[in-house]
C-alpha cells in the first residue's frame, strides 16, 4: 500500500515519527508510532 512518513513535534518537545500503511481501497490506515 501507500506509505506516508510524517514527523510531528508536540508541546512536550517529543518527536514522533509515524509510518502510515494504507492497506486497502477502504482507506484502512495503520499508524506505527516511534518515540525518539
UniProtKB/Swiss-Prot annotation:
<protein>
    <recommendedName>
        <fullName>Endoglucanase Cel12A</fullName>
        <ecNumber>3.2.1.4</ecNumber>
    </recommendedName>
</protein>
<comment type="function">
    <text>Has carboxymethylcellulase activity.</text>
</comment>
<keyword id="KW-0624">Polysaccharide degradation</keyword>
<keyword id="KW-0378">Hydrolase</keyword>
<dbReference type="GO" id="GO:0030245">
    <property type="term" value="P:cellulose catabolic process"/>
</dbReference>
<comment type="similarity">
    <text>Belongs to the glycosyl hydrolase 12 (cellulase H) family.</text>
</comment>
<dbReference type="GO" id="GO:0008810">
    <property type="term" value="F:cellulase activity"/>
</dbReference>
<keyword id="KW-0136">Cellulose degradation</keyword>
<keyword id="KW-0119">Carbohydrate metabolism</keyword>
<keyword id="KW-0964">Secreted</keyword>
<keyword id="KW-0326">Glycosidase</keyword>
<dbReference type="GO" id="GO:0005576">
    <property type="term" value="C:extracellular region"/>
</dbReference>
Amino acid at each position: 500500500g501507500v506509505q506516508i512518513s510524517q514527523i510531528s513535534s508536540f508541546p512536550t518537545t517529543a518527536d514522533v515519527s509515524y509510518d502510515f500503511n494504507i492497506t486497502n481501497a477502504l482507506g484502512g490506515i495503520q499508524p506505527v508510532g516511534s518515540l525518539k
